[in-house]
Amino acid sequence: MPRERDPGLIPPSKNSAFQTNEQNDPKGAWATNQDLLVNIKGEGKVKMPTLTSDPTLQLSNDEILRYSRHLIMPEVAMEGQLKLKQAKVLCIGAGGLGTPLALYLAAAGVGTLGMVDFDVVDFTNLQRQVIHDTDDVGRPKLESARDTIRDINPNVEVIPYETHLNSENALEIFKDYDIVADGTDNFPTRYLVNDACVLLGKPNVYGSIFRFEGQASVFYAKEGPCYRCLYPEPPPPGLVPSCAEGGVLGVLPGIVGSIQALETIKLILGKGKPLIGRLLLFDALNLKFRELKLRKNPECPVCGTHPTVTKLIDYEQFCGIRGEEHVPETHVPEITAKEVKQMMDEKKPFVLVDVREPHEYQICRIDGAKLIPLGDVPKRMHELNSADDIVVHCRSGVRSARAVEFLMKSGFKKIHNLKGGVLAWARDVDPSMPSY
Amino acid sequence: MAVKVVIPTPLRQFAGKKDSVDIDAKTVGEALAGLTSQFGDLRKHLFNEEGKLRSFVNVYVNDEDIRFLQKDQTPVNDSDVISIVPSIAGGSLIRCICS
């Protein structure tokens, strides 16, 4: 359930124009305007959802000045700006993608911005999550985001949900919003957001990033395919996050999240050709945009002709995440950073193996460690002697656990995983070592 | 006849770090077989134990999903581009396709 609203946050107004409007309109906020049929390239007509307008709603003189560059464009004009003011958009995540989403939607005058996140700002966020400042490190992301949004546009009502989005609370949170913008970073939440949007008939403005590559689309099952039409199932269990393969160029979420903000605004205005039925691929390294056709899958388990998913399920289980973290096939013996330091001080002979990548080794290293990146362990294990005591480490202990597991299967018995990796070493043994 | 296969970022580490590979093939199935025989590590990331394309990996010929064409029998010629498009979770914590 969403937590009780912090009394320090802007309370949602009880009489927002949108709610009044919703009460008067039995069809709900989305009405199909036949004038806004938009031709999608060779795909026939797509009905664009558009907000019904409240004739009593007006802009103040201050707002007219603020939005003047919108108002002088016929595609937005007063009618469009009032639609934006009435619109309620829910951003899932206040991180890399949520940053441009929230900043641009707020600046553009979207009246109500819900934000779901339970994280706290840390230093590693600042390279891309420009909604948060250095001074915000340690604060809840939603508090920090709310302050920035308030500075940009005090007319925007921010509704924070400092909670972990799950099957119990998603429908309740989503139901009051017109559009959901998905800026999450994990598969269980992706499928949860998709299914909840399909069940409630709401558009899901999707964005996703990996290193130098981004994807964006609008999944709106009433008019086109959903995320499950594209990917029926997530990657199977056992595929765990790896810091060696992670990382993201700081600008990339700025670009993909801005595309999501743009699509959200187009949906609200009912203008242009939305990304419904199209998957946009962005390759930042080669600066290439490509577009793929997405088709509605008649056998889709959630939006197909005979859906098998008719209510929200356990998405952690669906994605095989639950219980995965600590179930290695063999028991991996562990050793703490302090114990390793003691062995060094006592000059006990042992071999320290670092299974990180060379570019990580350049950031920081434990003196005397032998670098064998995880991927090279099978072909380089002849460099190790199974008669020696061996300690294996990586950044946080995940990759080294895999290496230990592999080496134990290959006959190594006097082998330990350094619990917590170099992060634990920096914390417990050598505070002068940088963390990353 | 060489068709261009575009390799997505998460899979480049299993394809000699290349962003695209030219393969002689007449169908999508032949192209993927050629690709995985050249880069053996790619196989388990593209296909399951039964040799079927994994459900979190989609393959396109130009801008069309092969699931809606003739699947692995979809014919290709040398002006076509085959794209492998895996699902990516995105954001700060990456759940990637790794071994």
Q: Can you describe what each PLM-predicted range is?
A:
Chain A
Residues 116-153:
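Glycine-rich phosphate-binding loop and adjoining beta1-alpha1-beta2 segment
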Residues 49-51, 147, 284-298, 302-350, ...:
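Rhodanese-like catalytic fold shared by cysteine-dependent sulfurtransferases
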Residues 47-52, 153-259, 269-271, 286-288, ...:
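E1/E1-like adenylate-forming module used to activate ubiquitin-like modifiers
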Residues 46-90, 312-314, 318-328:
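N-terminal charged helix/coil linker that caps or initiates catalytic domains
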Residues 80-106, 112-117:
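Glycine-rich adenosine-cofactor-binding loop
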Residues 96-99, 110, 120-121, 184-188, ...:
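Residue-level detector of alpha-helix initiation sites
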Residues 84, 173-178, 384-385:
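A short, aliphatic-rich alpha-helical micro-motif
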